[in-house]
C-alpha cells in the first residue's frame, strides 16, 4: 500500500484524500491543516489523522477540541508520497521541506512549472513522471485541455489550437472572489497563461488561449477551435472522444444546456460533493469545417484534477503504467 500524505485539506486536498482512501493500493497517511475550521473537524470525522501545518497555530486545535497527531513534518516523514494541496505559492515554499525528508511530492497547477521535475497529465504524459521526486499536476483548465488535445493529436495531428476560456469568478465557498456584476478579460493580454501551461505537457504544440472571468461559481466553459492535420467527419471525431474515459460526451437528449443542469446531473448521479471529474463535452457542439474542429466543454474546477493526483502518485511509485493506473482510479471513483 502506498502511504499518501495530503498537506492542505481545502477544496482540492479533501477531495484527493477521499479519492486516495477509495483506491485499492493506497492509504491516507494523514492530512495537514493550518487552522481548526470545519474542514479540520470533518477530516477527523472521516477518520483521517490530522497534522498541524503551522507551528504557531498548533495550540489552536486542542483549544477547539480537535485532536492532532503532530506537526506536518511527522506526516511528511511517514508518507511514501505527499500531495501538496496548499494555496498557490505555498507549495514552492514547502519544496525544501519535502526534499529534506526525501519524500516525493506532487504539487498543484497554481505553482510555477519550475517547482517540479515534470508537469503531469495522466492521459498525455504519464510515463514522464516515473520515479520523479517532484511532479506538478497542471491546473484544472490545462487538465481539461490536455485530455481533449491528446486523442485529437494522436488520431488526426494538430496544426493549431485556439481556445477561449470563460472562467468562473470563484468557487462556491470563496466569498472573497469575483467579479459580482462584470465580465473581465483576464488577462487582457494574449495569450492567457493556459497556453504556455499546455506547452509544459505538449512542448511543440502551437496554441493560443484567451481568458475571461464571469460572475459564476459552478464551472469553467471552454470554446475550442483546433485546426487538424486531417479532415475527419464530425461523427468520427465524436466516436474518438466518446472513447475517452475522462471525457463525458453529453448526449443531446439529456437536455443539459448549461453548467447548472450539469451540476444537478452530478448530484442526481450521486457524485460526492456533486463532483464532475471528467471533461463535460456537448456532443452536439462537435463540428468539423474542413480541417477545423469546434466544440464546447465545461470543466469542474474543484474536482477534475483529483483523479490526476491519484495517477501521479502511481506514476511516482512506478507501480502501474498509464492505462492500468487510469483504469484503477476510474473504477475506484466510479468514473
UniProtKB/Swiss-Prot annotation:
Q: Which cysteines are joined by disulfide bonds?
A: none
Q: Name where it mostly resides.
A: cytoplasm
A Pfam family found in this protein is: DapB_N
EC id: 1.2.1.59
- The answer to keyword NAD applying to this record is yes
Q: Which HAMAP family match?
A: G3P_dehdrog_arch
Tell me what this protein is called: Glyceraldehyde-3-phosphate dehydrogenase
Organism from which the protein derives: Halobacterium salinarum (strain ATCC 700922 / JCM 11081 / NRC-1) (Halobacterium halobium)
